Every structure is written in C-alpha cells, then in structure tokens.
C-alpha cells in the first residue's frame, strides 16, 4: 500500500515542483535593483575599467550594451531608507519616487559613442549626488533608479 501511494504522489510532486520552481527563480524588481545598482563596498570604483567590469559581472551587457547605469556605494539599508525621504515626481510622471536627503557616493557608467555590442566600453565617473529612486512593495523598497541631482 505504501509503495502504491509513493508511485502516485511522486509524479504529483514532480509536477508541482516543475510549476513552482520557475517562479522562485524569477528575479523580483527589488532584487533586480540590487543587482543593477548596489555596490556597497565599491572598493575599486575609482578604476577606469570599473564600469566595464561591473556592467559585465552584473549581466547588463548580455544581449546588448545598457547605455547608462549608476552604482551606489552605500549600505543597502541607507538606500532603502530613501523610500521614506522626500517624495518627488518620477520622470515617467508617477508619484512613487523619493529623493535622498543627503548626497551619496555613486559611480556613473555611460556607454562610449564608438562602443558596439558585444564589446561594450563604458566611461566611469564618480560623484557624490542625491539619488532619486522609485519604490514599491511591502516592505517599501527601491525598484527603479530614476535620476541623480
């Protein structure tokens, strides 16, 4: 009797896991924000090759060259705290953007004019600027990097 139950339940388990697992592997908007914009230690951000290395490592040059990206060199908790700071209008007109109250250490990566995929070549520039992020969810966390000011 136990073997019969196992033979029935095992295929059901395989079906359920096959259905559930892909959704577990999907990257949430908050996880994507962290992958694309957070580099808390940022130890080598002063290197001229920082953007080339990080853009590749963080998978932003896989199918095309992402034209612009900003990395924030502050603790994740500090960037998440921006979601409770000054509410501002996003570039797309939505009202879920927030501006940091203090300037943060960032690295701006911009694709050079003569750069072509798959040889993505970026200009690396360091700044201390206020950031604007779009926030969503519960907990309310950054899901989109909107601008720097």
UniProtKB/Swiss-Prot annotation:
CDD domains: RNase_A_canonical
A GO MF term: nucleic acid binding
Active site: 37, 144
Reactions accelerated catalytically: an [RNA] containing cytidine + H2O = an [RNA]-3'-cytidine-3'-phosphate + a 5'-hydroxy-ribonucleotide-3'-[RNA]; an [RNA] containing uridine + H2O = an [RNA]-3'-uridine-3'-phosphate + a 5'-hydroxy-ribonucleotide-3'-[RNA]
Record's keyword annotation contains Acetylation: no
BP GO terms, sorted: defense response to Gram-positive bacterium
Signal sequence, start to end: 1-25
Protein name per UniProt: Ribonuclease pancreatic
Organism, scientific name: Uranomys ruddi (White-bellied brush-furred rat)
């Amino acid at each position: 009797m136990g073997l019969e139950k196992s033979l029935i339940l095992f295929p059901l388990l395989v079906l359920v896991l096959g259905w559930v697992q892909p959704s577990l592997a999907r990257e949430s908007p908050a996880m994507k924000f962290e992958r694309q914009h957070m580099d808390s230690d940022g130890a080598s951000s002063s290197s001229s090759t920082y953007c080339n290395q990080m853009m590749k490592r963080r998978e932003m040059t896989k199918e095309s060259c992402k034209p612009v990206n900003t990395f924030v060199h502050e603790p994740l908790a500090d960037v998440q705290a921006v979601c409770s700071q000054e509410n501002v209008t996003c570039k797309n007109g939505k009202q879920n953007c927030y501006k940091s109250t203090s300037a943060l250490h960032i690295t701006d990566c911009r694709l050079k004019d003569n750069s072509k995929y798959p040889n993505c070549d970026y200009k690396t520039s360091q700044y201390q600027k206020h950031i604007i992020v779009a926030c969503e969810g519960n907990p309310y966390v950054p899901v989109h990097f909107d601008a720097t000011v």
